């Protein structure tokens, strides 16, 4: 039987009086064959410092629990089984009581009013097996952003217990198509990663394709056909302000943000060639990356921003290639029958997802 040990950092800034902690070993998730056993975690009700915050505290807990359970790595311990109830946020939990009901981890929190009508969520994460506090944080935000506060809290727990990067506080941007056949309307839309908070963004009047969101969830890139040919548009999500990215004589398409959000890789069709270019967003400086009579497009950055994977027919058929993000020789990585395209690097950088077309 393999065991996957999850690294647990030492406690961060404690929110209350100093606590006595014991050094414990890492929490473990047991992997039997191909099946992952979710980590049991207890999440008592969030204590509202003001009775008027009771409903909102329950909503925040619901989102946190849903995020953790949806990841497939955590299992919520049934609150009906709790031995210790009404645990004070500033107190040390009775670790034995939580271990007795099978909880490996315990998350406690309280919701408080903050200055200027804002909210403050304080939370602490405990290792019930190692009898220690693993994490203590506070988040402050506007009342209407309570879902984002919940997602950020879930992100902190997820990263602390798995060592993986957070993703709950992220958004999905897409093209929404509605209306009867023959009168379909396409609109640029955005929603939280859990499908909530759907809203439509003001966009170009014509066809909109392939939207990409920036790493900080503040801007979006997409292809607009307002001028009759594909052009890349950069839009601020909050203000709706739009601008065309560059003024090129040919077609521009397939944009994607760099991991730091400071650069965009794109394809430009100039003088009969379609090559990859990188553009700095601060000064709009353009840098050519490939020089090939083939079609080079659909580039995606590696998580560290040092490499690019893209599709090209330079070898006679549509295949995948990897090259340095600063430019340089490209190495083919796909072989065999079919056409390979639309590559995207995984967040950890160990895998590349792509499409493969066989036959027609």
Question: What is each PLM-predicted segment?
Answer:
Residues 129, 192-196, 236-240, 280-284, ...:
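Short loop/turn segments that connect beta-strands within beta-propeller blades
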Residues 26-94, 107-113:
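Short beta-strand->alpha-helix linker/helix-N-cap micro-motif
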């Amino acid at each position: 039987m393999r065991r996957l040990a999850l690294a647990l950092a030492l406690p961060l800034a404690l929110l209350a009086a100093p606590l006595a902690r014991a050094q414990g070993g890492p929490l473990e998730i047991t992997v039997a064959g191909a099946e992952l056993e979710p980590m049991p975690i207890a999440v008592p009700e969030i204590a509202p410092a003001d009775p008027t915050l009771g409903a909102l505290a329950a909503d925040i807990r619901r989102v946190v629990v849903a995020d953790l359970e949806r990841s497939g790595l955590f299992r919520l311990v049934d609150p009906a089984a709790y031995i210790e109830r009404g645990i004070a946020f500033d107190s040390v939990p009775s670790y034995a009581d939580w271990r007795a009901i099978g909880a490996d981890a315990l998350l406690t929190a309280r919701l408080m009013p903050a200055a200027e009508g804002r909210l403050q969520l304080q939370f602490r994460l405990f290792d019930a097996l190692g009898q220690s506090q693993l994490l203590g944080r506070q988040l402050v935000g506007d009342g209407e952003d309570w879902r984002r506060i919940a997602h950020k809290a879930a992100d902190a727990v997820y990263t602390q217990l798995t060592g993986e990067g957070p993703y709950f506080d992220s958004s999905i941007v897409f093209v929404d198509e509605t209306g009867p056949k023959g009168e379909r309307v396409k609109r640029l839309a955005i929603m939280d990663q859990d499908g909530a908070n759907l809203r439509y963004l003001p966009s170009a009047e014509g066809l909109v394709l392939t939207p990409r969101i920036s790493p900080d969830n503040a801007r979006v890139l997409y292809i607009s056909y307002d001028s009759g040919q594909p052009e890349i548009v950069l839009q601020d999500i909050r203000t709706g302000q739009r601008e065309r990215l560059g003024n090129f004589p040919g077609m521009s398409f397939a944009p994607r943000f760099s991991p730091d959000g400071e650069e965009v890789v794109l394809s430009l069709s100039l003088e009969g060639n379609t090559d990859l270019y990188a553009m700095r967003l601060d000064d709009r400086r353009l840098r050519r990356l490939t020089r090939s009579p083939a079609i080079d497009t659909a580039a995606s950055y590696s998580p560290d921003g040092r490499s690019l994977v893209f599709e090209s027919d330079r070898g006679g058929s549509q295949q995948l290639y990897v090259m340095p993000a600063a430019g340089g020789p490209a190495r083919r990585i796909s072989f065999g029958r079919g056409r390979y395209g639309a590559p995207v690097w995984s967040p950890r950088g160990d895998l590349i997802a792509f499409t493969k077309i066989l036959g027609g």
